[in-house]
Amino acid sequence: RNVNAEEVQRNENAYVLNTYGRAKSRVITHGKGVLCFDSEGNEYLDFTAGIAVNCLGHADEKLAEVIAEQAKTLLHTSNLYHTEPQASLAKKLVETSFAERAFFCNSGTEANEACVKFARKYHYEKFRKMSRSDQEFYKKPATETVSFKNGFHGRTMGALALTWKEQYRKPFEPLMPGNAFATYGDLKSAAKVIKRGKTAVVFVEPAQGEGGIFPADAE
């Protein structure tokens, strides 16, 4: 269908909360595979892929069929009930990866928020089971975090504390306390900020994506 780009942008500016800068004069209408098309018929190679989430590309027929069938069957039940698709997908993910369990969420920032909670819960239980002498030595469960310079972990309050760029963090301070930044790809730098009994979790990206693509050394 025909899309009026100017009207779309006027409506965006008038009714959508402006939290993200969008490309001016570009209204994307549809895609196929690695290609996107705008309202004027221009064709683009989609190098962003929804910021690294559209792994099957746009308009994948099999994926569209599965989504449509599920939408016609059962849409959402919350976590209060068992459902077969969730159980089957978790089983497949675990059997084909390193993980022992699967956790489903909506975004990377939500995954990182959950990771902080998982780590804190783990160290809380670990501390609770310690001998009294060990509890007196450590004083409290480990809660601190470590992430790396130039890393990006999300824009919610916990994940934002792990994110390097000050321009992202400054307007929302004070953030979650207790995070230290190490130099990416430098184990000695990481060793200086990882503290026994205090550091609960270390966040590291196999390849950083802020300002380019920077893979870590294998070691």
Which residues fall in each region the model found?
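Active-site-adjacent loop/helix segments that line or gate small-molecule/cofactor pockets in enzymes
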Residues: 1-31, 80
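Active-site core of PLP-dependent enzymes with the aminotransferase class I/II
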Residues: 192, 207-219
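Generic structural signal for well-ordered, non-membrane alpha-helical segments
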Residues: 5, 29, 60, 82-86, ...
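Acidic active-site catalytic centers that drive phospho-/nucleotidyl reactions
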Residues: 38, 46, 70, 110-113, ...
